[in-house]
Structure formats: C-alpha cells, structure tokens
Amino acid sequence: MIVDKVTIYCESGSGGQGCTCDLMLSSRRIIGGGGRGGKGGDVVLRVSPHHSDLVWFRGRKEFIAHAGARGEYNNRKGKEAENFYVNVPVGTIVRDLQENIIVDLNQKNQEFVICKGGHGGEGNYKKFYSLPPAPGEEKEAILDYRIPAQVVFLGLANGGKTSIFNKLTNKNAKVADYPFTTQSPLWADCEYRYRLFCVMDTPPIKESHEATHEHNRFLRHLYRPKILVFVSGNVDTYKTEFKKIKAEIALFDAALLEDKTCFYVLNKSDTFKKTPKDKKLILISCARGKGIETLREKLFNTLNHSQ
C-alpha cells in the first residue's frame, strides 16, 4: 500500500544573537561595534520528481532548521543559516491540524516556505544597546498526497481494468483470473501524439456491506482526475455494476463525482454473442487489442479540450 497521509513537525531557525562590543575610534572616543546576527534557516517544502508517495516520512517526521550565527565585532554580520528543504511528491496537499488547506503542491519544482526563519538580533554598532533576535516558527502540518493522475479506471473485480491500463501505458502490472489482483493504485504516463497524460488503475471497488473502511480508502485519489472511466467485462450486468460503483463513490465522498467527465467501457467484447446498442459504451477487447487506440484518442481529446 502507498503511504499517502502523514503528520510532520517543522521548526525554522531563530535569528543569531546580535553582538555587543566596543569599538575604539580614538583614545577619547568609543562607540558600539557589534554586528547583526544572521537570519535563521527557513523550512521549505519542495516538490521532487524522485518521490512517488510519502513512505520516506515513516522514518522521519521532525524537520528543524539551524539558527543564524552570532554577529561579530567591527560590525560584521553573522552568517545566515541554510534553508532546510523537505522533498515531497507532486500532488501533495499541505493542511493544518484542522484539515484546512494551506497549499496545494501540484506543480513540478514548486516550493513553499512552511516556517520562516527569524531575523537576526541587532548589534550595538553606533549605539549603546543591542536588540534580541526573532525566534523561529513552529508548525505541525498534515501532508495529504493525492495521485496526480488525469484519468482513473474504476470497476468491480475481474472487469479488466489492469489489462486496459497495461495496454495504454505499456506497463506490466500483475493480471490474473482471480479477483482483487490489484491491491493498491497504480499510475503511469500514457502517450498520444507525442504528448503524455497520467492514467491510474485502482483496486476493485467493494460494496459497503462487505468493504472495510480501509479497502475503499483509495477513492480519495479521485480528487485530481478529470476523467472517470467505469469498466465492466460483463455484457449482462454492466449497467448494474456502473450504478454500484457510482453509489460507493458517493457514499465515500459525493464531491468526488462533481465536475468529472465519465466514460463507460465494456471490455471482453470479443466474447459477446450480441453487441449492446448503448451509444454511451466504448467497446474494447484487451485480448485482441480491439478499441484500445480509440479509447486512447477519446481520452486525449477530452483532456485537450478541457484545458
């Protein structure tokens, strides 16, 4: 299972202490000569292409930046502390402990200062007093990772979602005849006309009377996709299956169905004795490769039109 939600503690560095010392200009004139302290380090959340979930945070949940250096005599400023960078995957939502969104890190190389370092204390240069530095900031935050897919495949067990996913992405995710082969969301890029879009395969949806809270928890990753693809491999029961899937999503969070484009895919069309006349259906056969390119084109055109 992917790790997609953790709580972390961040603390930026306090400013460096200002220096208090005397500077003798002549035998009769003495002034303050202490320099300002350096700025404390920020704690910065940074989107990294090398992270695909939050598993790294299992072993470390506290991130503390260094304090700025003390000011020096002869009005020399203390060295500023380096910023502390915390790498997160693209698609991470940062929330406070009340679950309010602070920032959505959904762009490559995006950065966000979650705790700002304190400014350095004033030295006593040309005056007879110094001022204390500012302390660093402390914050607990929730990192809520939502897979940045644009298309998601949904279905009950043994509908052929993973086979379609493999065909579109040229991946080799596990496929078997027994149910619940896919245990965790899978995502990869699909190419069309030299452009890429991200598609996601999901575990089979369980009906509420037989599902634990954890099993359908992957539905939280429907937050980002613009297209929901409902998949069935049974020509006799596909309408009922699609209704069940929508009902389970609505039960989990009805907002996940809002502002989405829905596709309805009927797999295993090579086994049908009679072809359904439902115009909403996209008929494909993964076994024979039939309809895959049509589906790829429809997905791309819909995404391209929505931008």
State the predicted function of each range:
Residues 1-157, 190-192, 200, 298-304:
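Conserved P-loop NTPase architecture
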